[in-house]
Every structure is written in structure tokens, then in C-alpha cells.
């Protein structure tokens, strides 16, 4: 990582705002397709013995001498390790086993995917300064040559809230 001054920043990204006076540059940062990455990770996990349980609700977790018993809508599973990767539902699993209860307030963000004709405006991911809701808005090239701009950030109550808005 290194700090770029205005001149070097403008050399690297000529379309950057004239108001930009400096930037943090991460030369080893890259762009991936998140869908393909997740499929590849799941394939690798399956080849290494991971069992997937789809459409199976976790109802309770119990610690045992050998690891965990997971009580589900499809029966009991035993495992040595549990990884809480439940996203906005991570608080539900955490609260099943911890005395220190937490609550996750879901936050929804919307992106705008620009046409490929806009793809040459920037050559790398550019973040604005972070705000109170997160890392801030970014503009990034995609692996398919488009530009992605966003996200917005709105706190919501519904953990299943995936609708989009006209304002988006």
C-alpha cells in the first residue's frame, strides 16, 4: 500500500475528480467474479469432504466433547467445527450458544451496473471516503468490462429484504 499524490493519481486515473487530492493505492488488489469464486470454493470444499445441507434449518446447537451437535429440521448432525457464515442471520446462531446476545441490523445496498461503453472510464477500483454506514461508494470495473457503481446503504428490519427501489 502507498499514498498517491494528486499528480500521480491523475496520471493513473485521468477521469478522477479534480477535487481528489490523494489516494491510497493497493497495487496487489484485484477484481474477481464473486459468483464464479463462490462456486469454485464450494467445489473445492466438496472435494475435501464438506457435506452441504441445503434447505435445512438449524434449530439448536450443543457443544459436546468431540465438537458440536447441530439440531436441524432434517435431523441431528455431528461435527468437530462450526463456521458461522450465516450473514444477516449470524446473530441468531451466535445467540444460540452465547450468553452475550447480539442483534444484527440488516443493511441493504443497491448497485448500478453501467454499460460496457462506460467500462474504460476507470481502470481500477476507486473508493470514496468511508461514511457512517460503511466503506463508502465505489466504482469498479467488472470482469466482463462493465462498471459497477455503489452501493447505497439503508438500514432495514426485514432480514429477507432484497427488493430494489426506484431511487436505487
Where on the chain are the PLM-derived regions?
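Flavin (FAD/FMN) cofactor-binding and adjacent substrate-gating region
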Residues: 1-54, 60-66, 71
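Active-site substrate-recognition segment that forms the wall
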Residues: 60, 76, 81, 86-168
Amino acid at each position: 500500500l502507498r499514498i498517491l499524490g494528486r499528480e500521480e493519481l491523475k496520471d493513473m486515473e485521468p477521469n478522477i475528480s479534480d477535487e481528489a487530492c490523494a489516494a491510497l493505492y493497493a497495487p496487489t488488489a484485484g477484481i474477481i467474479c464473486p459468483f464464479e469464486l463462490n462456486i469454485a470454493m464450494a467445489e473445492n470444499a466438496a472435494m475435501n469432504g464438506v457435506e452441504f445441507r441445503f434447505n435445512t434449518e438449524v434449530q439448536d446447537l450443543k457443544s459436546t466433547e468431540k465438537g458440536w451437535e447441530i439440531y436441524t429440521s432434517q435431523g441431528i448432525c455431528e461435527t468437530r467445527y462450526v463456521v458461522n457464515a450465516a450473514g444477516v442471520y449470524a446473530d441468531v446462531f451466535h445467540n444460540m450458544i452465547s450468553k452475550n446476545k447480539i442483534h444484527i441490523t440488516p443493511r441493504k445496498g443497491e448497485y448500478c451496473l453501467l454499460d460496457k461503453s462506460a467500462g474504460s472510464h476507470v481502470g481500477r477500483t476507486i473508493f470514496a471516503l468511508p461514511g457512517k454506514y460503511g466503506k463508502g461508494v465505489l466504482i469498479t470495473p467488472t470482469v466482463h468490462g462493465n462498471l459497477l457503481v455503489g452501493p447505497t446503504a439503508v438500514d432495514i428490519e426485514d432480514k429477507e429484504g432484497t427488493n430494489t427501489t426506484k431511487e436505487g
